[in-house]
Amino acid sequence: MTDTHSIAQPFEAEVSPANNRQLTVSYASRYPDYSRIPAITLKGQWLETAGFATGTAVDVKVMEGCIVLTAQPPAAEESELMQSLRQVCKLSARKQKQVQEFIGVISSKTPR
């Protein structure tokens, strides 16, 4: 007798046959010896429909006989203050000290 948890339930596949693509591994030439290296090119409007718009960061997982591409969510935009802080970090130590002193002056509660 089978357990109720071992009975297969019908389900719809996440990927329909209409969404399958057939590709062939081609090659690209590598300079300076022009050796051939394997290459796969993906292009088409279906990429954007699948969540891979131009500029999307992609995570690539490689296994034997399998490559999985996952679109990464867009990074949250930095606030204007954080962008300014990153700019200050690139300044010289003397200028960073001046910025710190300026912040100290404008944040002090004592009137002048």
Swiss-Prot record:
InterPro entries: SpoVT-AbrB_dom, Toxin_SymE-like, TypeI_TA_SymE. The keyword RNA-binding applies. Its EC number is 3.1.-.-. GO terms for biological process: RNA metabolic process. GO terms for molecular function: DNA binding; RNA binding; RNA endonuclease activity. Its main location: cytoplasm. It comes from the Bacteria. GO terms for cellular component: cytoplasm. Keywords: Cytoplasm, DNA-binding, Endonuclease, Hydrolase, Nuclease, RNA-binding. It is found in: Cytoplasm. Residues 29-74 form the SpoVT-AbrB domain. Pfam families: SymE_toxin (PF08845). Coiled coil: none annotated. Involved in the degradation and recycling of damaged RNA. It is itself a target for degradation by the ATP-dependent protease Lon. Belongs to the SymE family. This is Endoribonuclease SymE. It comes from Escherichia coli O127:H6 (strain E2348/69 / EPEC). The gene is symE.
